[in-house]
């Protein structure tokens, strides 16, 4: 067994089980540096085990469908139903069977600093990805609920021509008029790994779009607020008026449009 604290730390990094004999051997080492390293590694392993258990639980819908004979399960989710500006974006993602991506969760639960890393991990592992984007003008024409459906259908359509085609859809709280077997799951982005994958793809895609809009329409804070009605956003609306990407069917934008047409 290594004796220097540095060597012990290196040995601990290779340990992946809480039952590893090295833990018992080091338990009698009275050096504070060793005990600190020991506890740190045990804590890290416990966190990894908890994450593995969480990811396994989020595959429950997929595993049941694999047993029924389905091969390519697509998760579908959207981002951007609530903002005052910008599009609604949906993603359709097919992951390999039993695929687990550390940290993948409902995009609202993932720290923003980790969005890009997990997004890239999904892109690398996914068998197929489709993205549907419905702009603010069509949202105003058909309403946000119907626009969300259109975005999801477009995301599925984007899979055409890719090697893997979905034979089952897991959808976050929505039912689609399409000839593919499907299941609507309430809070699906927190309960299905496939839907969670779609959630982060849609989130990062939309955030990138809003960052671009921030450069085109500076002053509204689109890169920061993503078009949502924050206090600062509402203040800028009052000061500068609406932009071409604001949703005229959403309040208070709707009232501002009406006010501007009245003498």
From Swiss-Prot:
UniProt keyword annotations, A-Z: Cytoplasm, Endonuclease, Hydrolase, Manganese, Metal-binding, Nuclease
Known catalytic reactions: Endonucleolytic cleavage to 5'-phosphomonoester
Record carries keyword Nuclease: yes
GO molecular function terms attached to this record: manganese ion binding; RNA binding; RNA-DNA hybrid ribonuclease activity
Free-text comment on the cofactor: Manganese or magnesium. Binds 1 divalent metal ion per monomer in the absence of substrate. May bind a second metal ion after substrate binding.
Domain RNase H type-2: 71-262
One Pfam family matching this protein: RNase_HII
Main location: cytoplasm
EC number: 3.1.26.4
Subcellular location: Cytoplasm
BP term (GO), one: mismatch repair
InterPro entries xrefs: RNase_HII, RNase_HII/HIII, RNase_HII/HIII_dom, RNaseH-like_sf, RNaseH_sf
UniProt similarity note: Belongs to the RNase HII family.
Protein name listed in UniProt: Ribonuclease HII
Biological source species: Streptococcus pyogenes serotype M3 (strain ATCC BAA-595 / MGAS315)
């Amino acid at each position: 067994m290594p004796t220097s604290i540095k060597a012990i730390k290196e040995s601990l990094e290779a340990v992946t089980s809480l039952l590893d004999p090295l833990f018992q051997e080091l338990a009698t080492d009275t050096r504070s540096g060793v005990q600190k390293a020991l506890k740190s590694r045990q804590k890290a392993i416990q966190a990894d085990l908890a994450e593995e258990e969480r990811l396994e639980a989020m595959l429950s819908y997929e595993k049941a469908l694999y047993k029924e004979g389905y091969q390519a399960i697509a998760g579908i989710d959207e981002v951007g139903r609530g903002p005052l500006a910008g599009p609604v974006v949906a993603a359709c993602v097919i992951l390999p069977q039993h695929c687990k991506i550390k940290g993948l969760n409902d995009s609202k639960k993932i720290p923003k600093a980790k969005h890009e890393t997990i997004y890239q991990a999904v892109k690398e592992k996914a068998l197929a990805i489709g993205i549907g984007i419905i702009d603010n003008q069509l949202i105003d024409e058909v309403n946000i609920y119907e626009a969300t459906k259109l975005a999801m259908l477009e995301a599925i359509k984007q899979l055409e021509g890719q090697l893997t085609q979905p034979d089952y859809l897991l959808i976050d709280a929505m039912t689609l008029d399409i000839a593919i077997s499907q299941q609507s799951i309430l809070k699906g982005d927190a309960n299905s790994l496939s839907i969670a994958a779609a959630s982060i793809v849609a989130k990062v895609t939309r955030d990138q779009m809003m960052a671009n809009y921030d450069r085109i329409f500076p002053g509204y804070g689109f890169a920061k607020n993503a078009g949502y009605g924050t206090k600062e956003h509402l203040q800028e609306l009052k000061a500068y008026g609406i932009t071409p990407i604001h949703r005229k069917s959403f309040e208070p934008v709707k009232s501002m449009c009406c006010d501007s047409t009245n003498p």
